[in-house]
């Protein structure tokens, strides 16, 4: 059983993990048996983190209710997301709540026996501005990697890090997600990589951690935030997108000189961006999903498919650098704008899962008397069960919202017509008209016809949850091939 430990650092880390979860829900194949998500974020109330954790919990409940074996063709929810190794997903950072940075580093205590300030005090005052020192940390480092580099170094002393190290096997891999233009990601990536490669020999599993293949994606600027024009300068947000590029250049310069311990490093960013509301963090920071986050999640898929990644004594044999590009410039990306290798990974899974979610949302209530539902007793008891009414319905809504957010972002990713069109159901893929089939039925009546034709081939002794998802996968796969030319 191979595992991929995915460290998501800061808000960008959580959002890329969200996109990865959506890809796995849709059935994108990834070359590991389990994903182990680990989030490093001092923002205790981060909305993006909260939403991602809820999504992964729903995903896991669905995955555990479905059999995945050679007999069942279903690919939806096919990869296990292991939430047991790091309960709650987040690796805690101690002593960062209700405290400012100068208290955290013990600045007032940097005195000798006579009460005179020590050289450490002078050094700290030189390294950190007065605003840095007075900064609180409960919502993160607010674009200050110099603060993050001090605070984040403590996570290796946590019980969660010890549990992580002990669970790593010799066939496992590690992947790190971070942004480069803020505070948490820019400081967290180099620190985490250093601590993984130089892990103490006293920890259980240390050799497996030290020599595990490590990949990373570093996300360059892809959005802006509105300036905070509060007349009280002391109350202005510390997040200033005017500094994103200069911070990126500084970090890239550091990476070039010092970052050579990863096996594969992916770079991604965009020069077209949307301006978000300025929020330093907490429950108000809810960024819409973005194509860049989806592409960053595809870096994780790519990494698992790379063979022969070796490391000896904490040093990789060589470092590979990769970038992502679309086939042609487009402010609104459709499938036709993507390279063939990307389409081979995502087009069928995203299309079939979108069909599944739209049917459940738009049509299912009108079709519960169809043979496919009656013959397998998909009745009120089933549709009111926790599996369907909570986990699957919440996942459906989150997925469709994820697609809608990407379609409304800049640069937009809009491969599907998401609006409800019951008289034109299969005009789903933007720019690709549906094929004609030999049938007197159309739209959702044709959808039901495919469900009815496939339901007789299901094993009758399986769990209802399994039968439901398997039936829809089989019917949608055949329907997508016939109407949408999806192979």
Describe the residue ranges of each PLM region:
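Terminal, contiguous helix-loop blocks that mediate binding/assembly
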Residues: 1-25, 29-172, 180, 201-487
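Short Gly/Thr/Asp-enriched flexible loops that form oxyanion-binding sites at enzyme active sites
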Residues: 21, 185-197
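Subunit-assembly interface segments of extracellular/virion macromolecular structures
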Residues: 173-174, 195
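A phosphate-binding catalytic loop at a beta-strand-loop-alpha-helix junction
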Residues: 178-186
């Amino acid at each position: 059983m191979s595992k991929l430990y995915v460290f998501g650092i800061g808000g960008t880390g959580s959002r890329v993990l969200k996109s990865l979860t959506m890809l796995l829900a849709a059935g994108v194949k990834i070359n590991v048996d389990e994903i182990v998500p680990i989030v490093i974020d001092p923002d205790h109330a981060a909305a993006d983190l909260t939403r991602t954790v809820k999504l992964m919990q729903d995903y896991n409940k669905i995955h555990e209710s479905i059999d995945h074996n050679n007999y069942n063709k279903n690919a939806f929810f096919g990869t296990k997301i292991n939430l047991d190794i790091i309960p709650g997903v987040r690796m805690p950072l101690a002593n960062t709540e209700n405290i400012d940075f100068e208290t955290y580093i013990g600045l007032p205590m940097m005195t000798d026996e006579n009460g005179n300030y020590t050289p450490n005090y002078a050094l700290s005052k030189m390294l950190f501005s007065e605003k840095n020192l007075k900064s609180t940390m409960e919502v993160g480092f607010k674009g200050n990697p110099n603060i993050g580099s001090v605070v984040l170094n403590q996570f290796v002393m946590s019980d969660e890090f010890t549990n992580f190290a002990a669970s790593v096997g010799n066939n496992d891999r590690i992947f790190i997600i971070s942004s480069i233009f803020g505070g948490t990601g820019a400081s967290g990536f180099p620190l985490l990589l250093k601590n993984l490669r130089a892990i103490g020999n006293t920890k259980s599993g240390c050799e497996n951690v030290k020599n595990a293949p490590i990949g990373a994606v570093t996300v360059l600027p892809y959005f802006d935030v509105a300036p905070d024009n509060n007349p009280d300068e002391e109350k202005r947000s510390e997040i200033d997108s005017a500094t994103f590029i200069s911070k990126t250049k500084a970090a890239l310069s550091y990476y070039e000189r010092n970052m050579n311990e990863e096996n594969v490093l992916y770079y991604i960013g965009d020069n077209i961006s949307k301006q978000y509301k300025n929020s330093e963090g907490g429950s108000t920071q809810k960024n819409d999903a973005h194509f860049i986050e989806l592409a960053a999640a595809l870096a994780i898929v790519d990494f698992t498919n790379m063979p022969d990644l070796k490391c000896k004594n904490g040093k990789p044999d060589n470092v590979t650098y990769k970038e992502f590009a679309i086939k042609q410039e487009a402010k609104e990306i459709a499938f036709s704008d993507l390279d063939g290798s990307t389409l081979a990974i995502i087009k069928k899974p995203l299309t079939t899962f979108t069909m599944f979610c739209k049917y459940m949302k738009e049509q299912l209530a009108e079709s519960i008397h169809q043979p496919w539902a009656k013959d397998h007793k998909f009745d009120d008891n089933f549709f009111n069960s926790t599996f369907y009414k909570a986990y699957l319905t919440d996942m459906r809504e989150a997925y469709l919202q994820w697609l809608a957010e990407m379609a409304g972002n800049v640069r937009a990713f809009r491969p599907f017509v998401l609006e409800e069109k019951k008289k034109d159901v299969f005009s789903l893929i933007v720019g690709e008209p549906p094929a004609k089939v030999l049938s007197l039925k159309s739209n959702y009546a044709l959808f039901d016809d495919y469900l009815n034709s496939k339901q007789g081939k299901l094993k009758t002794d399986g769990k209802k949850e399994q039968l439901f998802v398997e039936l829809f996968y089989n019917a949608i796969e055949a329907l997508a091939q016939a109407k949408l030319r999806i192979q």
